[in-house]
Structure formats: structure tokens, C-alpha cells
Design a protein with these regions (language model features):
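Glycine-rich phosphate-binding loops of nucleotide-dependent enzymes
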Residues: 1-242
């Protein structure tokens, strides 16, 4: 059953068509990958899903209801949380206070939930430290804890492996699968690291110049000639041209 559906979504920026009639489903309980070259429209799709952008046409349906009637601040309460390509945190606030921003409730219950999420991502020992000066990989875990404390049904991860080395990327893949299982949620993943996407995704969607050019299992996508030409021609594990 589809938890999320984009239905013929188009989004323009002046004369540039960032998304051109894009349609795809994300099945509940799965990890789905959304891939494509730089500028393909992946982050724009995330921004449409989370209502930061309104599509020029088409619809976004979540749990059977259109999201286009929801305000931006209502998306988290609908059950969608996300991380960003560039980490978005309050640098003068502590790890705990940053995670509390994502909590639905306030007071003692919220603090307990936030500490539980912080502990889950392995940062309990620095919960009271300001995030300024923390390593980039740690900041990404803080952002992930903030997303998890909201109790989402759908978790959007925008390039979570950015800045990580090979061993850290492998660990991240296992962690994303663990999150899916432990929190019983669905994951939509935008990522340039092909080994990560193909290794953990149940289904992969491929964008190129704002159009959906392929969808299927990792094996099907890897074998698709259009994908090979557009994106997977390199074999360095990153999907980037040398």
C-alpha cells in the first residue's frame, strides 16, 4: 500500500522546469531511494512533499489525503519528518534543545522523548553541549534525532551520507535499516552514494532533468540503459563523474 504518492507533479522556477509531471509511490514500511544527477529535482521533490514549495500542478497524497491543503508547519503533525542536505540546527543551543524543537509536546514528557532519541543516535553523553563546534557527522545525528522525536510515519533523508567516509557510509546503511525496523516507519532517501542506495533500498526512483526516467528494484534500475546513461556510468561508488 502506498503511504506517499506524487501524482503528475510539476514545479517551475521561472523558465526552469525542476519537476516535470513526476509521479511515484512510496510503499509503507519500505526504504525507497530517489536518485539522479545534480540538478535532477530530488531536493525540489522533498521540498514539495514538505510544503516548502507548492507545485504548479499535480498532487501529493499522504495516507490517502492531499498534502496541498496542509500548511508548512502542519506537515510534521501529519507524520512526515526530514533531514536536510545542509544541516539545519541552532548553533548556540544544546543538543537537547535542538532535538526538543522537533517534539510535539512540551515539558517533562518532551524532554524524556528527546533524551530517548538522543540516546538512540548515540549522543546521550553530549546532550547538554552546544552544537557549535561539534563534528559534522555528529551534527547530522543531532538532526536525525530531532526528526525521530517527532514520531514520523515517513522519514525523508536528504543526502545523509554527505561528508562521511566509506566505513561510516556502511554503518549508516545498517543504521537506516535499524531505524526503519525499530521505529516502524517508511524511509525516502535522496543520496549520491550508489552503493548505499542500492544496498538498502527496496525500490528506487530515478530523476533526470526533472523527469522520472526509471523506477524499480535496485537490480532493475542498475540494468536500465537510461539510468546507466544518465547517472550510473561511473563506478566509484558515489555516482559522481570523475
Amino acid at each position: 500500500m502506498a503511504l506517499l504518492s506524487l501524482r503528475n507533479v510539476t514545479r517551475r522556477f521561472g523558465g526552469v522546469v525542476a519537476l516535470d509531471g513526476v509521479s511515484f509511490d512510496v510503499v509503507e514500511g519500505q526504504i525507497a531511494g530517489l536518485i539522479g544527477p545534480n540538478g535532477a529535482g530530488k531536493t525540489t521533490a522533498f521540498n514539495v512533499i514538505t510544503r516548502l514549495y507548492t507545485p504548479d500542478s499535480g498532487d501529493v497524497v499522504f495516507r490517502g489525503e492531499s498534502l496541498l491543503r496542509s500548511p508548512v508547519h502542519g506537515i510534521v503533525r501529519r507524520g512526515i519528518a526530514r533531514t536536510f542536505q545542509n544541516v539545519e540546527l541552532f548553533r548556540t543551543m544544546t543538543v537537547l534543545d535542538n532535538v526538543l524543537v522537533g517534539a510535539h509536546t512540551r515539558g517533562r514528557d518532551a524532554t524524556g522523548q528527546a533524551l530517548e532519541a538522543i540516546d538512540y543516535v548515540g549522543l546521550r553523553q553530549i546532550a547538554e553541549r552546544p552544537v557549535a563546534g561539534l563534528p559534522y557527522g555528529t551534527l547530522k545525528r543531532v538532526e536525525l534525532a530531532r526528526a525521530l522525536v517527532a514520531g514520523p510515519k515517513l522519514l525523508l533523508l536528504d543526502e545523509p551520507a554527505g561528508g562521511l567516509n566509506h566505513e561510516e557510509v556502511e554503518e549508516l546503511g545498517r543504521f537506516i535499516q535499524q531505524i526503519r525496523d525499530d521505529y516502524e516507519l517508511t524511509v525516502l532517501l535522496v543520496e549520491h552514494h550508489m552503493n548505499l542506495v542500492m544496498g538498502i533500498s527496496d525500490h528506487v526512483h530515478v530523476l533526470n532533468f526533472g523527469r522520472m526516467i526509471a523506477q524499480g528494484t535496485p537490480a532493475e534500475v542498475r540494468a536500465n540503459p537510461d539510468v546507466i546513461e544518465a547517472y550510473l556510468g561511473t563506478d566509484d561508488g558515489t555516482g559522481r563523474d570523475a
